[in-house]
Amino acid sequence: SFGGVKANVDISMNVEKGKIVGLIGPNGSGKTTLFNSIVGTYPIDNGSIKFNGKEVSELPVPVIAKLGLLRTFQQTRIYGKLNCIENMLISHKGSDANLMKIFSKIPKELTEKAENLLNFVGLYQKRKLRAGDLSFGQQKLLELAMALMNEPEMLLLDEPTAGINPTLINGIIDRLIKVNQDFGITLLVIEHNMRVIMQLAENIFCLAH
């Protein structure tokens, strides 16, 4: 609750491992708030949140992330002045917050992993380009690749196609399906574009006001 305003009430949902599940609902219905609660950003007042059978509702964000539960955002969280490879390396769960330490001695296999994932999302040719110079759609793909660097078991995607050129949407749909099928990652997707969610999701939950 926020100052007496209850954001998510009487919600019960189960996301089956290995599936793509959609989450829809009108603006203000609490979809993003639910995501923030699942990953530990917002504490819950009561109820339970379990991941792989483990109660996670009282765990901090970094601990939940290390368990393999990650999310992306409506507005991308990238480092605009760093190039794509550097963004990938700094997002890795084993990275120190000190940039000099991260980039002074990088294991070859980590760089190769970053390059392979950038190739997977179609950004290999732009790997040395500053992230701030990418289009918004390309930044979304970079953020997806950054999440994949940490090998999540489950990924929460908050409107992955919002603000993207319609001609690029099919490519993003295809890549998300490949993330699920090739990497075995469970996806929970907030999306307002019903065409997208119908193509992606096997099951869909709807939040009402």
Give residue ranges: language-model regions.
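The feature captures the beta-strand-to-loop junction immediately N-terminal to the Walker
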Residues: 24-26
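Conserved ABC transporter NBD signature motif
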Residues: 47-54, 67
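Conserved ABC ATPase "signature" region
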Residues: 101-126, 174-177
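Conserved catalytic motifs of ABC-family nucleotide-binding domains
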Residues: 151
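Catalytic Walker B motif of ABC-type/P-loop ATPase nucleotide-binding domains
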Residues: 155-159
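Helical segment within the ABC ATPase nucleotide-binding domain
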Residues: 170-183
